[in-house]
Each structure stands twice: as structure tokens, then as C-alpha cells.
Amino acid sequence: MKEVRQLAEGIRCFSEEKKPEMENFLASLVNRESGSYDTEDVNALGDFLVKVCTEMGGSVTRHRSRVHADPIACTFGCKDNPDARRILLVCHRDTVFPHGTTKTRPYTEDEKNCYGPGCADMKGGIAIGIYAIRLLQTIGESVPVEIIFTSDEEIGSEASEEFVKCRAKNAKAAFFLEPARANGALVTGRNGGDLLTLTVKGHSSHAGNAFEDGVSAVHGIARVITQMAELSDTPAGYSTNVGLVSGGEGAIVVADHAQARIYTRFSTLEQREFLLSRFKAICEANTQGGLKVSISAPVGFLPFLPNEANHQLFELVKVAGNAFGLSLTGVNVRGAADAGITSCAGVPTICGMGIVGGNLHTDREYAVKASLPERLNVLALSIVLANRTYA
């Protein structure tokens, strides 16, 4: 068994040699469209990644989704024992950017950073995950590892959540390759979040001649969303944002329909249940006088909570970082992501193991080029150490 110092040296040699190749691979990923709602694009990127992983000797599992693009898992080092416990690497291949973005804003770079849609969130993480597996194969470290490419993380993981839960059943540990913070910090905790659709139905009428015959869904939804927004308690760690409202046909028509999109943020599962129960009560209380008020089932993210198992994995990652002269730190963030899926399932989990970057979800998104080999080093050594640590 190689010592940590010997392993680190072999890993460093690989990453330094492959840095230009990795940058080219990242550029090819960024220039492939994969907006969350563009199913064909996200599946096409999935096809490309399946080809890459198959050529590396991976075994592919693909779930055909009826709601969004397909989540995919590629497994390595498990052919002799398909049920072997393995290390999970989890990436999402969708971005927030719609089809056509790469034509007007393709991958570019300067001396320090690279730019382009999803370069940090999270195509940089995909590149690091793929090359971590290649690295381990090259240096002769036989580790059962599975890389998951989810399809819809940016819109709530409706197609991917159950897939990740299922794949986590045989997991020793899970590394989520979301970008590290701009200062290089890893992510050791995240809020949960839900997306919901509020629907109000009323009765239309002429707003002048027959105003009293109508039941306004727009007036109704105004009351309901005000009551829901008032549930927010930011110091306690939960909030309700009504981000999109629509309804009605025109100013001279009493509206018979209205709809709102709501995003909740919460720190604990108990807070999530509180918000959902209050939403239900508000809908029931306002279903009267000809109004019908309903809210959809939540689609979103479980909270990624700090716990002892996750802390131990973070300490292991810090050991890996120290081997390359890095003093890694961890932060809890408000933004939700998929790490809560494995953490809530009892799998030691850490997030932010991808490329260092910032200005996510904007046309100014960037990734730090020097962090590509740097974070590859940390991930590869962390995989080996986790495989040795967890039975």
C-alpha cells in the first residue's frame, strides 16, 4: 500500500502533465449546450460523457426520465463485484443557461481564468471527476468508484433525486463536485430548498357590467401570497420567496385563474414540514366564496446538515489538501444543492469539491484555471483515503 506522500507525488505528476488536456476537455464541455429545460441538449451531453466513460472501461446505468433529461451513472472497478461498496462522485450536467448561449458566449480564457456558461457550475467539476478516475487508473490505484451525471439539478432534481438515492445505497462516501467558493473553501453544509406552484381558480365576469358576479383569482392570490411570504423568519433560517406571479386575461375581466411560483429555503427538515403544513392551511382557509386554492407537491433539495460523519470526511479531505500544501476550509451556505440527498441517507458527504470559481449563474461566471489540477489532486487523494477509511 502506497504511503500518502508517495501517492501525492504520483498524483501531482499526472495533473501537471495533463493540465492542458484538462483545459481543452473543459472547453469542450462548456461549448456543449445543456440548459436544464433543453432535454435534447442535456441528453446529448450525457451521450458524450457515456462515450468518454465507456472508453475508460466504465459500466453505464441510465434512467430514462419522463420529466427531464436522463440521469446517468458510470461505475469503475466493480465488474467482478457489481454490489461492491464504492466512492460516489456526483455532478450535474445541466446549467441555468438556455439553448444558444454558447453561440453568443462560448468558452474563453485569459491568463488566470476561463469563462463561459457553466464553466464553474459545474462543468469544471465534471472535468475534475473524469480526470480523477483516469488518474487513479494511471497510477494503479484500484478503487471502486461511481460518477453520477444528474440531469436537472438547477431546477430541483425532480428526475434525479430518486436515482441518486438508489445509487447511494452502496456508497462508502459521496463527493459532490459543485464549485468551491471563490476563496477556495469547500462546502460543509447547505440549506434545503423547495420549488412549488400555487394555483388559484375563481369565476370570470365583466369587470364593469357584472363585477359582483365574478370571483377574482388575482385578488385571491394576492391575499394568499402575502400570507405565505409573512411566514419567513430569516434569523431562524427559513424563508418564502414568491418569485413569479401570473393571471387574468385583461383589466376589464374579473380573473378566473392565477398562478405563482414559490421558492422556500430552510435549514432543517422540521422547518420544511412547518412551511408545507402552513401552506396547506393557508390554501384551505382561502378556499371559500367561489375560490379554489391549491399548491403543488414540493420539488427541491433536502438540507445538507453538518454531522459527525460529514465532519470526519471533511477532516480526511483536509489531510489530502495538506499533502499538496493546501489548508482547506469549509463553509455552510444558503444555496441548496443535491448533497442533502446522500447526507440524509446516512452517507458521509462533502460538497464544493470542484473547480474554484465565482459569479455563478451570470454572464460573468468564471473558473480559476490553476485550480483545475489543484482540485484534481485533492479529489484523487481523498478518494483513495476514503476508500481505505470506510469499510
For each feature predicted by the language model, list its residue ranges.
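Short glycine-aspartate micro-motif
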Residues: 86-88, 114, 172-176, 197, ...
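Active-site metal-coordination/substrate-binding segment of hydrolases
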Residues: 83-146, 155, 169, 368-369, ...
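Acidic, glycine-rich active-site loops and adjacent beta-strand->loop/helix elements
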Residues: 93-95, 148-155, 178-181, 204, ...
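Metal-dependent amide/peptide-bond hydrolase catalytic core
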Residues: 1-10, 17, 34, 61-64, ...
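Acidic/histidine-rich catalytic neighborhood of metal-dependent amide-processing enzymes
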Residues: 122-191, 233, 387-391
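Acidic/His- and Gly-rich active-site-bordering loop/insert found
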Residues: 2-117, 138, 321, 339
